[in-house]
Amino acid sequence: MDEELKNLIKVWVSAIISISYCYYIPPRIKSGAPRFLSVSPVLALFLVLPLFFSSLHLSLITAFFLTWLANFKLILFSFDKGPLIPIPTNFPRFFCFTCFPIKVQQNPKSQNHLPKLVFAIKLAIFAVLLHLYSYRQNLSPTILLGLYFVHLYLEIEIILTFVKVVVFISLGCDLEPQSNKPYLATSLQDFWGRRWNLMVPAILRPAVYAPMRRVSERKMSSGWALFPGILAAFIVSGLVHELLFFYLIREMPTGEVTLFFVLHGVCTAVELAVKKKTTVAQRWRLSPGVSRVLTVGFVFVTGGWLFTPQLKRSGVMERFTSEAVLLVEFIKR
């Protein structure tokens, strides 16, 4: 643990120095290829930093914040696009909005408060979940898989809520939520675009979807050009997840997780095409309850088929849950 804490300090001091360079130097360079070249050493460094950790949690969190979010935001920043344009007014804001999955609320509410009851319930469920792992040998694979998905959702929610609160206290500005009750999604488009991990689609839209759609519009109508954009965004997301899996497993990718996102990209595109191009979908609509069951069920089944097998084969799922239990015990002390 002591060695991991030392690595944590080294990694994030390196991140602070790198982001400070990006704040003071590249903005003075012409946008486009010249500015991209100026930030490319930072992009390369952020690809390496997660490898400094043996802890799954520290490696994954660092990879998500730096390798994925920060790198994509800096690439967009190189071309005067994305959430870093206009450039934040001071370095602390620039650092937070570069590294963390947050953005300023466009229409701030008069009162911004943490939904304490909901957060407390999530913490309680997470505590019960960690306790259930003591009996994992008595649980069926299907139930255990369900627990893993709930664990993933709750841990992401808890970590991102803490980040949001710390940044809100530090910067004093209203921040948009990181997710919007993904378990209530009524379609794949609703799940991936408006409910799950909202900062990711907010980055993929300008970085991947919009450029691909513009290119596709040269060959087809604008109504059809959105489908290559959707598929491209899911493919890029799959490739990034392969990289995240590499940081966890330290083995060559198998392509399963990319296939998971390609499948969801194709299904989302088909779903959208049916809604837009057929009158049957407009006349015949499922009830919200049935739509939610089908959507969440599809994510669960395909996740068990393609997303988690590599993690289970490598023992990462067991290590990840055991590490969470040890972390809670460490905090209690």
Curated annotation (Swiss-Prot):
Q: Which UniProt keywords apply?
A: Acyltransferase, Lipid biosynthesis, Lipid metabolism, Membrane, Transferase, Transmembrane, Transmembrane helix
Q: Which GO terms describe its cellular component?
A: membrane
The family annotation for this protein states:
Belongs to the wax synthase family.
Chain's gene name: AT5
Catalysed reactions, semicolon-separated: a long chain fatty alcohol + a fatty acyl-CoA = a wax ester + CoA
- UniProt-annotated location(s): Membrane
Q: Where is it predominantly found?
A: membrane
Q: What is the lineage of its organism?
A: Eukaryota, Viridiplantae, Streptophyta, Embryophyta, Tracheophyta
Cited function: Catalyzes the final step in the synthesis of long-chain linear esters (waxes).
| Entry EC number(s) | 2.3.1.75
**InterPro entries from the xrefs?**
Wax_synthase, Wax_synthase_dom, Wax_synthase_Magnoliopsida
Organism equals Arabidopsis thaliana
Q: Name one GO molecular function term.
A: long-chain-alcohol O-fatty-acyltransferase activity
* Membrane-traversing stretches: 7-27, 45-65, 114-134, 143-163, 229-249, 254-274, 288-308
Q: Name one GO biological process term.
A: lipid metabolic process
Q: What is this protein called?
A: Probable long-chain-alcohol O-fatty-acyltransferase 5
Q: Which domain of life is it from?
A: Eukaryota
- Is Lipid metabolism among the key words of this record? yes
Topology relative to the membrane, per the entry?
Multi-pass membrane protein
User: Under which main EC class is this enzyme filed?
Assistant: transferase
